[in-house]
Curated annotation (Swiss-Prot):
One Pfam family named in its UniProt record: RnaseA
Family, per entry: Belongs to the pancreatic ribonuclease family.
SMART domains the UniProt entry points to: RNAse_Pc (SM00092)
Name of this chain's protein: Amphinase-1
Domain of life: Eukaryota
The keyword Transcription regulation appears for this protein: no
PTM note: There are at least five different forms arising from glycan heterogeneity.
CDD domains associated with the record: RNase_A_canonical
Positions bearing carbohydrate: N27, N67, N91
Amino acid sequence: KPKEDREWEKFKTKHITSQSVADFNCNRTMNDPAYTPDGQCKPVNTFIHSTTGPVKEICRRATGRVNKSSTQQFTLTTCKNPIRCKYSQSNTTNFICITCRDNYPVHFVKTGKC
């Protein structure tokens, strides 16, 4: 697989969820081995409640590696500040800033415009 495809697959796993805000649980999700590759709790992670299409759309016509802002707002859940891997969870609706590489989202930069 090309590098962008692998990075996009990783981005989807780490940042896009089909679960509703009501069903989403930071502790259950963040303690999954996918988010603790080195056995450490990740300090913060933001999840986008969306299908993949609208997120990938942000990177349409993005050549090379560039940060882009979404034109629409997304429902987001941020899991952060784990104490012994127990996370605080906050929900918001906002724009997102992501890094695109050749039309694929590869990195979540921040909540809000770039």
